[in-house]
Structures are given as structure tokens and as C-alpha cells.
Amino acid sequence: MARPTKKTGTKKQKKNVPNGIAHIQSTFNNTIVTIADTKGDVVSWASAGSSGFKGAKKGTPFAAQTAADAAARRAIDQGMRQIEVMVSGPGAGRETAIRALQGAGLEITLIRDVTPIPHNGCRPPKRRRV
């Protein structure tokens, strides 16, 4: 019988980053929370889809809260204490994601809205008729 091969992959080492930047990208269909250190290297991330939501439920505020909570817990395990929050997009999960980051135990020092606003750029999609 053949012997099982040993794993030779690199194990992810625990960083010790006390402060960082949280990017919340909230669209109508999903919310993505990425927490990086001050250099820009990603420490943890989570999305509504990776938190177990599918379809239209990914765009809900509760899904954004769950995603932000998961990302914050992983960042706290890496030693993060303080974050600056950059919010982008028009989605429903913007405020709830910020509250979830705060509720998870991270101290928020700054909240900035970095949503790109066109100077009359592309034509927007047509109105929905339901």
C-alpha cells in the first residue's frame, strides 16, 4: 500500500497588524468587505456570497452584516485593532457593514465615501418596468 504524501504547501503565517483599512464595496447585488493593512496587503476579506447567501439575498443588509462580521473576526485574529473605512457603491449594505465592523470589536477612526461619481460619463441603464 502506498504511503500518503506529506503536504508541502506554505502555511499562512499569522501577521501582527494593529491598524488597517477596510474597503466596503456595496452594489445592488452583493457586498464585498476587504480589510488590508496600511501598506495595502490584504489581511482578510469576505462577501455576501462567500458567507453563504445566494441570488437576490446577497444584496440585503443582513448579508452585508454577516460578511463584515466574518472579515472583522479574521482581521482581529491577525491582531488588528483600528481601521479606517472606505465605502464605495450605492448598495443597501453600506451602513450595516460599518456597524458590524464596529460591533465586532474594531475601533473605527475614519469613514470616507469613495464612490466614483461621473462628470456625465456613460449613459445609465434604462428604468425598470415591473
Swiss-Prot record:
InterPro entries from the entry?
A: Ribosomal_uS11, Ribosomal_uS11_bac-type, Ribosomal_uS11_CS, Ribosomal_uS11_sf
One example of the protein's molecular function in GO is: structural constituent of ribosome
Keywords annotated in UniProt: Ribonucleoprotein, Ribosomal protein, RNA-binding, rRNA-binding
Endoplasmic reticulum found in the keyword field? no
Pfam families found in the cross-reference section = Ribosomal_S11
Give the GO cellular component terms, alphabetically: ribonucleoprotein complex; ribosome
Disulphide bridges in this chain? none
Q: Which family does it belong to?
A: Belongs to the universal ribosomal protein uS11 family.
- What is the annotated role of this protein in its UniProt record? Located on the platform of the 30S subunit, it bridges several disparate RNA helices of the 16S rRNA. Forms part of the Shine-Dalgarno cleft in the 70S ribosome.
The UniProt entry, under NCBIfam families, shows:
PRK05309.1, uS11_bact
Record-given protein name: Small ribosomal subunit protein uS11
